[in-house]
Amino acid sequence: MIEPLDSPASDSDFLDYPSALGNCTDEQISFKMQYLPVIYSIIFLVGFPGNTVAISIYIFKMRPWRGSTVIMLNLALTDLLYLTSLPFLIHYYASGENWIFGDFMCKFIRFGFHFNLYSSILFLTCFSLFRYVVIIHPMSCFSIQKTRWAVVACAGVWVISLVAVMPMTFLITSTTRTNRSACLDLTSSDDLTTIKWYNLILTATTFCLPLVIVTLCYTTIISTLTHGPRTHSCFKQKARRLTILLLLVFYICFLPFHILRVIRIESRLLSISCSIESHIHEAYIVSRPLAALNTFGNLLLYVVVSNNFQQAFCSIVRCKASGDLEQGKKDSCSNNP
């Protein structure tokens, strides 16, 4: 049985963390060596060039800029910043959790993951609210479509994300164990009581609330388009695609990670069997790159949101748009926020 961790561990206990847990984490270290480098490598190899191309399109090809263009550009930027940190994590897990880049980089890389996570959540929430106003309150959309409102919203997202994630630089720790430096994530760091309450507040304000907002926005949008007078097939089809994509990102990528992070922290605070804690930790490990897969969903979102983006992408890769794409551009609903 594992002793409850109701108070901060001593330095000797902390440095002997794997020994204190016995065999609870032995299999996880091996599992992480096999699983995380592969998944993170795939995410990096697809996401880095994909977001680089997306940013280039938004900056050099997309004119005029709408509110949605500003939000999508900021979303691509935060994804790209996160993707640049993945090679460090790939090396770390592939080497058996041996961190060679120092304490500052440990905190910076862990900070980068969570900053991207909550920036993405908030940018997608802003986009959903803009779509809601355009479709449900179309008379107000002429004001909200102006790019200055999107710029203000994006600036707010950057500030809120920075403030929300900043405490992690103090809570996340690195340590030395068995002659190796380990860069611990939030759930494995010390001071669990503080981490528990910080995690609950962070999850409630920057995930649960946006999840409710996004769900309500898109259920209202679909209901309005289904029963309302606006029945343009192109508009309805595009709204359905956006709804499915956004809800998949929130419920498949983000939700499991947040649920399992709460459970993982609680499992370290409670006196439970090594077997149960091992299974909880393993499930949490699986959920971490799953959360990072939102970068794939975002790449699809760029294409779904705008037919102009599709045309610009085709021009970059030197391909000719199909007749359907040309027709889609003519018939596309131009009410993007």
UniProtKB/Swiss-Prot annotation:
PROSITE patterns (alphabetical): G_PROTEIN_RECEP_F1_2
Q: Which residues are glycosylated?
A: N23
Q: Which residues lie on this side of the membrane: Extracellular?
A: 1-38, 91-116, 173-200, 264-284
Glycoprotein is among the record's keywords: yes
> What's a single GO MF annotation on this record?
AMP binding
Question: InterPro entries attached here?
Answer: GPCR_Rhodpsn, GPCR_Rhodpsn_7TM
Disulfide pairs here are C106-C183
Q: How does it sit in the membrane?
A: Multi-pass membrane protein
Q: Which UniProt keywords apply?
A: Cell membrane, Disulfide bond, G-protein coupled receptor, Glycoprotein, Immunity, Innate immunity, Membrane, Receptor, Transducer, Transmembrane, Transmembrane helix
Q: Which residue stretches are annotated as topological domain Cytoplasmic?
A: 60-69, 138-151, 222-242, 306-337
Tissue range of expression? Predominantly expressed in the kidney with limited expression in the testis and the smooth muscle. Expressed in SLC26A4/pendrin-positive type B and non-A non-B intercalated cells (at protein level).
List residues traversing the bilayer. Answer: 39-59, 70-90, 117-137, 152-172, 201-221, 243-263, 285-305
**GO biological process annotations for this chain's record?**
adenylate cyclase-modulating G protein-coupled receptor signaling pathway; phospholipase C-activating G protein-coupled receptor signaling pathway
Question: What domain of life does the UniProt record list for this protein's source?
Answer: Eukaryota
One Pfam family cited in the UniProt record for this chain: 7tm_1
Cell compartment(s), UniProt: Cell membrane
Q: Which GO terms describe its cellular component?
A: plasma membrane
Q: Does the keyword Transmembrane helix apply?
A: yes
Its biological function? G protein-coupled receptor for dicarboxylates and amino dicarboxylates. Receptor for itaconate produced by activated macrophages upon bacterial infection. In the respiratory epithelium, couples the binding of itaconate to the activation of GNA11 and downstream intracellular Ca(2+) release, leading to mucocilliary clearance of airborne pathogens. Receptor for leukotriene E4 (LTE4) produced by mast cells upon allergic inflammation. Binds with high affinity to LTE4 and elicits mucin release from pulmonary epithelium in response to airborne fungi allergens.
Please report which protein family the annotation says this sequence is part of: Belongs to the G-protein coupled receptor 1 family.
Record-given protein name = 2-oxoglutarate receptor 1
Q: Which organism is it from?
A: Mus musculus (Mouse)
